[in-house]
Amino acid sequence: MKKLIIALGVLTLLYFTATLFVPPYIEGQRNPVKLASPYTISSEAQKIYNRLDFISDLHCDALLWGRDLTERGTRGHVDFPRMREANVGLEMFTIVTKSPAGQNMKSNSADSFDNITPLTIAKGESPANWFSLINRTLSQSNDLAGFISEEEGKAIFVKSKADLEQLIQVRSTDKSVIGAMLGIEGAHALEGSLENLDLVYEAGVRMIGPTHFFDNKLGGSAHGENLGGLTDFGRQVITRMNELGIFIDLAHCSPAIVDDVLSMTTEPVMVSHIGVKAVLNSQRNLSDKQIKRIAANGGIIGVAFFDMAVGEPELPNIIATIRHIRDVVGIEYIALG
């Protein structure tokens, strides 16, 4: 019995040690920064940037890695201090609950081993989160709420139009105040339950992508196996999202789901991070026809800043993507993604 107790003690010590070192290592491998700071910026560009009244970004997975977002980090790009340094007023923090092994842009199986499970365990999260997508969602929601609470009025959890208007008003005189919204990448997080949709709404979620990198109960992913449209359950979810006031994010949806959503939604959509086929002809990116339908819906398109969406070299292609959307429908439909 004594040896068993010692063995359990050693294992416990090893586990808690792993929670300190493994998540940062995984983030360093999976979420690398291509160009390290300091960055060279022309004085003219800096002047233009400083004149911008309100900067927002529609996509950030920083909650996934277990970092304290109230502290300036050394990994990734985003936390509250670096938002302030960059004059970013509003960030959409998105929750990732499942990632298939061998994740790629072309075809992924929903039955593949889930990469997020070992990360969840390594982060030292509650065993209730280890194998539950909805619990992972609520845990990350609570994390964001906690970070905002720690800011003692210097951060606003944006859950409504009134919250956004308050943020804009406050930032007109105090740029140190920042805002955060909450989204979900892939409605598989709902685990097939409409009741869970109401649950995540109460937790502060205001944007959900029907699919992420694989097909689910709502329909087909742009990177899945069947490229199908909305299922009956998918249509129920879209209807309920409209009723609640949750933005529909089409960033990873199959073309069929994009068409189905635009045909039935009663509210403007978002495409949080994406490119266009005219610049990079990938199955994920938007055609001119889709761009026009999104604009007609009153939606916005977040241009992604990475090679899988815009191709390489990235910066010229980001500019080309922005210009293309501008030329097709107008600058007012473009956002940062």
Show which residues each predicted segment covers.
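A generic structural motif
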Residues: 273, 336-337
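N-terminal hydrophobic targeting/anchoring segments and the immediately downstream early-domain regions
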Residues: 2-209, 213-225, 281-291, 295-302, ...
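Active-site core of metal-dependent hydrolases
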Residues: 210-212, 217-290, 302-311
